[in-house]
Swiss-Prot record:
Enzyme nomenclature, EC number: 2.7.7.6
Pfam families linked: RNA_pol_Rpb2_1, RNA_pol_Rpb2_2, RNA_pol_Rpb2_3, RNA_pol_Rpb2_45, RNA_pol_Rpb2_6, RNA_pol_Rpb2_7
Single GO BP term: DNA-templated transcription
Signal peptide as annotated in the record: none
Listed HAMAP family: RNApol_bact_RpoB
Name of the protein this chain belongs to: DNA-directed RNA polymerase subunit beta
UniProt-recorded Gene Ontology molecular function terms: DNA binding; DNA-directed RNA polymerase activity; ribonucleoside binding
UniProt xrefs under InterPro entries: DNA-dir_RNA_pol_bsu_ext_1_sf, DNA-dir_RNA_pol_bsu_external_1, DNA-dir_RNA_pol_su2, DNA-dir_RNAP_su2_dom, DNA-dir_RNAP_su2_hyb_sf, RNA_pol_bsu_bac, RNA_pol_bsu_CS, RNA_pol_bsu_protrusion
GO cellular component, one term: DNA-directed RNA polymerase complex
Family: Belongs to the RNA polymerase beta chain family.
Its biological purpose: DNA-dependent RNA polymerase catalyzes the transcription of DNA into RNA using the four ribonucleoside triphosphates as substrates.
Catalytic activity: RNA(n) + a ribonucleoside 5'-triphosphate = RNA(n+1) + diphosphate
């Protein structure tokens, strides 16, 4: 391979992964959230000028509904343009306040009123106005929406593409097993039109899956008569009738093939086919060669054939026979008598020319177009009396109007391609030349003028009959060329259009009033329906989902998810096996591995790494072009339809130095099959080996060595990993980790290059490079505020930590700060643990995991979870609830964490049951006598009339209070705590703005200094004309006096003026921004109706790993921690180092996930190399030797590896820094399907001076004895999953009971009990433990008196129980009584 040197960014230089990939990357990993971000950007077209907007998204929806005309046609409302305002609250404020992040949509509309009197449409007056149409949610830059304070993701939908589809019933409908073919035209919106055969080979049609009608009724409604229908669908044989006897047939020899004649077929005297013999293709050739044009046939050859047209007596005009009649002998005689010289018959046979339409016409009861329209009306609206107009309108509105029917550009393209037309454009309604030519409205005339003589409906029926005749194939609906992706933008547009259509109805009514009453557009349009539709979609649609925010990977995969469920999609119950299965077209488009287990398997998929959607919404995947066996670097994206025509080689096909394919036969894919082809026949080649898998699957090293089912679990479980306290990069990765972390948006990346000026835990300030500074007021300072200890949707902790130091030189895109689960800009979901595969006293039976106490001590798997607890004070019927520290019947001790407002302090450590917010609720009481009222008024006795309803820490939770927020309704006085929080928030914002301004100001002055020092001045404070400006002079001046300098040089004078303007502009801007922020902080909050005050308390809970927690590797090897063993008892190596985790070796063979073994070996080598580097650094080896050793690690097999690491780019200091970062282990990348080979792993182990078998002798920690054979030991990246025993374990003594049965509720959330089910009852019965059983079924469950009595007895210290009647027995008695059977218990 040629040497490919990559230049490393500031972040990458800190730690470089050794890459084992053999294929050089042609394409970088694309921006992973593009499908979301691009789709919504197209929907909004925010940055496009109104007159240049494309016909997409909001613009298209508004254009399709407007103009709205009144019923009389004298007034119309036209659409001019729209603009989006600025959002009121930014993302952070929306999250905090529970608001939705969006911007107001203002649409400019024009009301036009026409003059009634004039004959032409003269305009009376025009009024243009901006109308507010509600809030449009905005997407954050990470592809999410903030709805009511929570982040949500709109999942893309994979639905059936509009167009026409041909299918058969697989022989299931009829008992004979005959294939019944059908066609279906699916529009984007509008009625479905189906065509289908019945077992007797007649053709039927259905509209919207209703009752079926003969297809000829539909054609007749379009205006075709019997003769025209037959002419469209059949070829015609012409017979000339001889006056006395016999018939002459105009011969087309091909049409005789397969027939058996009962007379000799001769050319003159020469007999070509004898009577009774079947005519073959050879005979046909002979006939053609002989040039026989006509054939004399006997009369009975014509009898029984089907007439293609009506036969009329020329002299009298009498109808002798109808089209579609079978000719009888009598009719033939009548034809002769009337002197008919020629008749046409349909050419049909049983083999490949079926008489389908002819059969259909025989069962068609209608004769005229009107009858057909009425028949369709009756089918669509049964029970309504049809009138001519109603029938015509209904039929026209079904398929031929733009308001009711829309194929869409995709549908039209698919339709035209399927019926074999070349052009992909056309009308979005079904077009029929004959039908539209007979109508005489403007729209129909325009359509007829623009289009050729085509008929969409006829062509579909023709293709269907061709397929029935055995020519043509049915479609595969699971082919990705027949399923398209609907992303956020498109779904939002549809919802918006639905809202607008509702508005349209209301506007139409009011427009008639507008003429007389002079209403303005604002008064005409009520925006509520639009706002409601959008709010409903983003808030509660099946595809608008609560974002999975466990870790960065789960965010990215959630946004890249593609679901077949949802409105207009499939349902779980109805989806069969075929839809869920992997299809050949999934290759490179949809991941073949990552899909949920369970009822949704195969219905929810993930986009492949390089997949993208094309303009029609079909998924495409990139390929490299191959010309005459030479592979080029040109990349072309192909959709599943286009790919069908090409032969495509694998990414790992062997090539030589000139990029020529070297093998004699190359393994390829063609039309879904795998085959071998010579290099000259190959058209394309895969871009990358990981093209077939999704992001999550591409993160699994050695995926190629894992069984697919386990790989699926591995990909899915990575999404459940909880971010640990200190992230640790995987020693063995795949090289895509950096891209995932970058695109997930959890890290802070530099917007522009520059130098780090100032840094603390919460903020990074960058002084931008001169070259990247824009003009105007841009002062060349970027300020990044970091997110500190915030709660995610899954209650995990989001926290960002700076990676850079003051003075570091960074470039655009460099990682400045790590987020959760990232380590120096790489995704790091778990920890690298030292693992041994061996049994250990049964503690790793059935996939259990044995942990060392060292893991707990070092907090390797300690995670922080942030819980949000809310206390709401409402206005009740009996008076308002109050939040205060004055709570009746509560000890002082219980209140010691509350301040005087009754809210817990920040920093308080609380346990289950502690009061966090004191709240009292007025309680209802009996009517007081006047005397009592008087006493109460005098002494103000309050304690008795309120009850304690404080917010307490829920059971099983303890933690530290890290934040408190108090929200107060507008117009209610804020309490002391709320004012304190408000003041501190204003202070913080003020400091933030002051700091920002100071930094900007300093940057502007520093730039100005560099521009004027050493220049000649014309004068200034204490400066004579002609003096030079010096640094010392400037230091002695007040900053604001610099602007009084008068420079000789024009450029310097301009610089001073520009600096002054910049500072003034920034000062103004900061003042305005601060005033705005201050206003938002001090204003009252918008709370739900009836809520006076709301307090949110955030608790940080620290969870250490403990028995019962679920852990997993990346290969689907999951298990539950069974025990945590003291370090001294763990097995240890000869060096004395104990292992961290002991796994069961029996978990490997039957699961067939060998990837974990390879990972362990390579991980051990990586760690060993790190140790070696550490020893070199400690011994202070010469830098040149370190450089040589690193070169040996990175480039030892540069002959086959694609990427070379060029260490000459590194200065000695950078190299030492790199070495320091590698002490923990040299990270390796083994890309999916292109990873490290066994030989390479051995080579690495050898470099690290470790045994090449990957096994070593372990010793028992408790006895010190050596185990009897060597053990596989090494490092594996192991994850802790978000299934923690703390969240699941739960105990109850007494608690809530179900209303009817009086049995305890179930589940942790309801504080329920454990169900003692029927199997448990059987166990007690088998033991004969009668009293225990009685206790279980009565006092511990639903014997109300018994359980109360039992509680009293326990309190009184009497340990006895009396079982009474279980409530469920009473329920049973009542149920039996409801069946009118009385049942009474007698003493």
């Amino acid at each position: 391979m040629e040497d490919l040197m990559t230049s490393y960014s500031f972040t990458e230089k800190k730690r470089i992964r050794k890459d084992f990939g053999k294929q050089r990357s042609i394409l970088e990993v694309p921006f992973l959230l593009a499908i979301q971000v691009d789709s919504y950007r197209e929907f909004l077209q925010e940055d496009v000028e109104p007159n240049k907007r494309k016909d997409l998204g909001l613009h298209a929806a508004l254009k399709s509904v407007f103009p709205i005309s009144s019923y009389s046609g004298n007034a119309a409302l036209e659409y001019v343009g729209y603009k989006l305002g600025e959002p009121v609250f930014d993302e952070r404020e929306c999250r905090q306040r529970g608001m939705s992040y969006g911007a107001p949509l203002r649409v400019t509309v024009r009301l036009v009123i026409y003059d009634r009197e004039s004959s032409t449409k003269a305009i009376k007056y025009v009024k243009e106005q901006e109308v507010y149409l509600g809030e449009i949610p905005l997407m954050t830059e990470n592809g999410t929406f903030i709805v009511n304070g929570t982040e949500r993701v709109i999942v893309s939908q994979l639905h059936r593409s509009p167009g026409v589809f041909f299918d058969h019933d697989r022989g299931k409908t009829h008992s004979s097993g005959k294939l019944l073919y059908s066609a279906r035209i699916i529009p984007y919106r509008g009625s479905w039109l189906d065509f289908e055969f019945d077992p007797k080979d007649a053709l039927f049609t259905r509209i919207d899956r209703r009752r079926k009608l003969p297809v000829s009724i539909l054609l007749r409604a379009l205006g075709y008569n019997n003769e025209e229908m037959l002419a469209e669908f059949f070829e015609i044989n012409t017979f000339h009738i001889n006056p006395d006897e016999g018939v002459q047939l105009e011969l087309v020899p091909e049409r005789l093939r397969g027939e058996t004649l009962n007379f000799d077929l001769a050319d003159g005297d020469k007999v070509i086919v004898e009577a009774g013999k079947r005519i073959t293709a050879r005979h046909v050739k002979q006939l053609e060669a002989a040039g026989v044009a006509a054939l004399a046939v006997p009369d009975d050859y014509l009898v029984g054939r089907i007439l293609s047209h009506d036969v009329v007596d020329g002299s009298t005009g009498e109808l002798l026979a109808n089209a579609n009649d079978e000719i009888s002998e009598d009719q033939l005689a009548a034809f002769r008598k009337a002197g008919v010289d020629a008749v046409g018959t349909l050419w049909v046979n049983d083999l490949d020319r079926g008489p389908y339409l002819s059969n259909t016409l025989r069962i068609d009861p209608t004769k005229t177009q009107l009858e057909a329209l009425v028949e369709i009306y009756r089918m669509m609206r049964p029970g309504e009396p049809p009138t001519k107009e109603a029938a015509q309108n209904l039929f026209h509105n079904l398929f031929f109007t733009f308001e009711r029917y829309d194929l869409s550009t995709v549908g039209r393209m698919k339709f035209n391609r399927r019926v074999g037309r070349k052009e992909v454009l056309g009308e979005s309604v079904l077009y029929d030349k004959k039908y539209f030519a007979e109508r005489n409205d403007e729209e129909s005339k325009r359509l007829v003028a623009e289009h050729a003589d085509t008929s969409d409906i006829l062509e579909v029926i023709k293709v269907l009959t061709e397929i029935r005749n055995g020519r043509g194939v049915v479609d595969d609906i699971d082919h990705l060329g027949n399923r398209r992706v609907r992303s956020v933008g498109e779904m939002a547009e549809n919802v918006f259009r639905v809202g607008l259509v509702r508005v349209e109805r209301a506007v139409k009514e009011r427009l008639s009033m507008a003429e007389s009453e002079g209403l303005t557009p604002q008064e005409l349009i009520n925006a509520k329906p639009v706002a409601a539709a959008i709010k409903e979609f983003f808030g509660s649609s099946q595809l608008s989902q609560f974002m999975d925010q466990n870790n960065p990977l789960s965010e990215v995969t959630h946004k890249r998810r593609v679901s077949a469920l949802g409105p207009g999609g499939l349902t779980r119950e109805r989806a069969g096996f075929e839809v869920r299965d992997v299809h050949p077209t999934h290759y490179g488009r949809v991941c073949t591995i990552e899909t949920p287990e369970g009822p949704n398997i195969g219905l929810i998929n993930s986009l492949a790494v390089f997949a993208r959607t094309n303009q029609y919404g079909f998924l495409e995947t990139p390929y490299r072009k191959v010309l005459d066996g030479k592979v080029s670097d040109d990349v072309e994206y192909l959709s599943a339809i286009e790919e069908n025509e090409y032969v495509i080689a694998q990414a790992n096909a062997l090539t030589d130095a000139k990029n020529m394919l070297t093998e004699q036969f190359v393994p390829c894919r063609f039309q879904g099959e795998s085959l071998l082809k010579p290099p000259a026949e190959v058209h394309f080649m895969d871009v990358s080996p990981m093209q077939t898998v999704s992001v999550a699957a591409a993160l699994v090293p050695f995926l190629e060595h894992d069984d697919a089912n386990r790989a699926l679990m591995g990909a899915n479980m990575q999404r459940q990993a909880v971010p640990t306290l200190r992230s640790q990069k995987p020693l063995v990765g795949t090289g895509i980790e950096r891209a995932v972390a970058r695109d997930s948006g959890v890290t802070v990346n530099a917007r522009r290059g520059g130098v780090i000026e100032q840094i603390d835990a919460a903020r990074i300030v960058v002084k931008v490079n001169e070259a990247e500074i824009g003009g105007g007021t841009d002062a060349g300072v970027d300020i990044y505020n970091l997110i500190k200890y915030t709660r995610s949707n899954q209650n995990t902790c989001i926290n960002q930590r700076p990676l850079v130091n003051v003075g570091d030189v960074i470039a655009r895109g460099d990682v400045l700060a790590d987020g959760p689960s990232t380590d120096i800009g790489e995704l790091a979901l778990g920890q690298n643990m030292l693992i041994a595969f061996m049994p250990w006293n049964g503690y790793n039976f059935e996939d259990s995991i044995l942990l060392s106490e060292r893991v707990v001590e070092e907090d390797r798997y300690t995670t922080i979870h942030i819980e949000e607890l809310t206390c709401v004070a409402r206005d009740t019927k009996l008076g308002p609830e109050e939040i205060s520290a004055d709570i009746p019947n509560v000890s002082e001790q219980a209140l010691n964490r509350l301040d005087e407002s009754g809210v817990v302090y920040i920093g308080a450590e609380v346990r289950a049951g502690d009061i966090m917010v004191g709240k009292v609720t007025p309680k209802g009481e009996s009517q007081l006598t006047p005397e009592e009222k008087l006493l109460r008024a005098i002494f103000g006795e309050k304690a008795s009339d309120v009850k304690d309803s404080s917010l307490r820490v829920p059971p099983g939770m303890d933690g530290t209070v890290i934040d408190v927020q108090v929200f107060t309704r507008d117009g209610i006085e804020k309490d002391k705590r709320a004012r304190q929080i408000e003041e501190s928030e204003i202070k913080r914002v003020k400091k933030d703005f002051d700091d920002q301004f100071r930094i900007l100001e300093a940057a502007i002055y520093a730039r100005l200094r560099s521009q004027i020092v050493g220049k000649v001045a014309n004068g200034g404070p204490n400066l004579k004309k002609g003096d030079n400006v010096t640094d010392a002079y400037l230091d002695g001046l007040k900053k604001s006096d610099w602007f009084q300098l008068r420079m000789k040089d024009d450029d310097a004078a301009d610089a001073i003026e520009r600096a002054q303007k910049q500072i003034q502009a920034h000062e103004k801007e900061f003042e305005a921004r601060f005033a705005d922020k201050r206003g938002k902080i001090t204003q009252g909050d918008d709370l739900a109706p009836g809520v006076l005050k709301m307090v949110k308390v955030f608790l940080a809970v620290k969870r250490r790993i403990q028995p019962g927690d679920k852990m997993a590797g990346r290969h689907g090897n999951k298990g539950v921690v069974s025990n945590v063993v003291p370090v001294e008892d763990m097995p240890y190596m000869a060096t004395g180092e104990p292992v961290d985790i002991v796994l069961n070796p029996l978990g490997v063979p039957s699961r067939m996930n060998i990837g974990q073994i390879l990972e362990v070996h390579l991980g051990w080598a990586a760690k060993g190399l790190g140790r070696k580097i550490q020893r070199m650094l400690e011994a202070q080896t010469a830098v040149s030797e370190l450089r040589k050793f690193l070169d040996d690690i990175y480039n030892h097999d540069s002959a086959i590896n694609a990427e070379r690491v060029d260490l000459s780019q590194f200065s000695d200091e950078e190299l030492l820094n790199l070495g320091k970062n590698l002490i923990d282990g040299v990270p390796m990348a083994t890309p999916v399907f292109d990873g490290a080979s066994e030989a390479e792993i051995k080579r690495m182990l050898e470099l690290a001076e470790l045994p090449q078998s990957g096994q070593t002798q372990l010793y028992d920690g408790r006895t010190g004895e050596a185990f009897d054979r060597k053990t596989t030991v090494g490092y594996m990246h192991y994850l802790k999953l978000n299934h923690l025993v703390d969240d699941k374990m739960h105990a109850r003594s007494t608690g809530p009971y179900s209303l009817v049965t009086q049995q305890p509720l179930g589940g942790k959330a309801q504080f329920g009990g454990q169900r003692f089910g029927e199997m448990e009852v059987w166990a007690l019965e088998a033991y004969g433990a009668a009293y225990t059983l009685q206790e279980m079924l009565t006092v511990k469950s639903d014997d109300v008196q018994g359980r109360n009595q039992m509680y009293k007895n326990i309190v009184d210290g009497e340990h006895e129980m009396v079982a009474g009647m279980p409530e469920s027995f009473n329920v049973l008695v009542k149920e039996i009584r409801s069946l009118a059977i009385n049942m009474e218990l007698e003493e």
